[in-house]
Every structure is written in C-alpha cells, then in structure tokens.
Amino acid sequence: MAAPADDRLGRAYAAPEVTVFYDRGRCRHYAECVRGLPQVFDPTRRPWIRADLADAQAVAEVVRRCPTGALHYRLLTEEAEEPTSPTIITTDSRGPLLVRGDLALDTTEGPLRETRAALCACGRTQNQPFCDGACGVNAGAAGGTRDQAETSPQKR
C-alpha cells in the first residue's frame, strides 16, 4: 500500500530514527499515545511530541494504537505502516466509526490511502469523511469532553 504523502499527514516531529506526523484535525483525544509513551507524547510540553525520547520501534508501536489515524510514523529503516487485514470496523459510543485496514477514502482534498481512521457517523463533521466531534459526544476514552478537546495540544 502506498503511504500518504507527508503533506497530508500533518505536522512532522523528527528524530534520528523515526518521524512522527500529527494531524490535529483528526485527533479525537483517545490518548493512546499519552498512555503508551508519556515521555514522548506529553501535552503539557512544547513541542508535545519528542520522538527522540524512546526507541523508534516503541514509538511506531504506540503510534499504531492511535484509532483515528491522527498519528502516523515513518521509520528511517522501514516502509510505511502495513494495514490490518481483514479490514475491521468498530462502533464507538463516543461517536465515530473506528476503521482499520487497507482503506481508500474519498476526502475533500482528494483520494487518500489510509490504515486507520475515525469516520463520522452523525453526518455533521466539517472534515468529511473524518469525525471532528461535531456531534458533541465525549471526545475520547480518556474522559476528555469536547470543551477539554478545544484546549488540548492540537490547538496550542
């Protein structure tokens, strides 16, 4: 599967062995990254992602936990993330459909190949086809509400 172009992945946080990309418009604050490697993903620090503070493989493993696809990685020594097979769709009481697999998405910016995404289930998103929390449902498993999401690291 071809990896998305770097300019479609979000802001880059480079370290010698791995680059982490963060797309704040897709983050729904599930906090898998913060729980997985708090020394790397620290929303109280600037920059909030420091990929150099852990082993590159450990960073990649935690990034793959991100259910929304807001985080991506590129290892210096390997190809891009491989998709899950078969494709898995999970419903989430907090709003989005969580999808993992070899995804071909039609977006407002054109076609996109993806491995993980939180897709809008309510139809109110301004970031089609991705969930942006427009439904006002709890923003993430960590207990963040929509109001908390607005003051999260993505906006700072």
Where are these predicted regions, by residue range?
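Boundary-flanking segments of nucleic-acid-binding domains in nuclear regulatory proteins
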Residues: 115-117, 129, 143-147
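Extracellular/lumenal glycan-associated surfaces
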Residues: 69-70, 101-102, 127-135
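Short, solvent-exposed interaction modules
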Residues: 86-118
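Cysteine-centered iron-sulfur cluster-binding motifs in ferredoxin-type domains/subunits
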Residues: 21-37, 53-69, 120-129
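Short, intrinsically disordered, charge-biased short linear motifs at domain edges
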Residues: 12-24, 50-55, 105-111, 115-121
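Ordered, small/hydrophobic-rich secondary-structure cores
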Residues: 2-40
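Non-heme iron-sulfur electron-transfer modules
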Residues: 1-10, 39-64, 72-94, 137-156
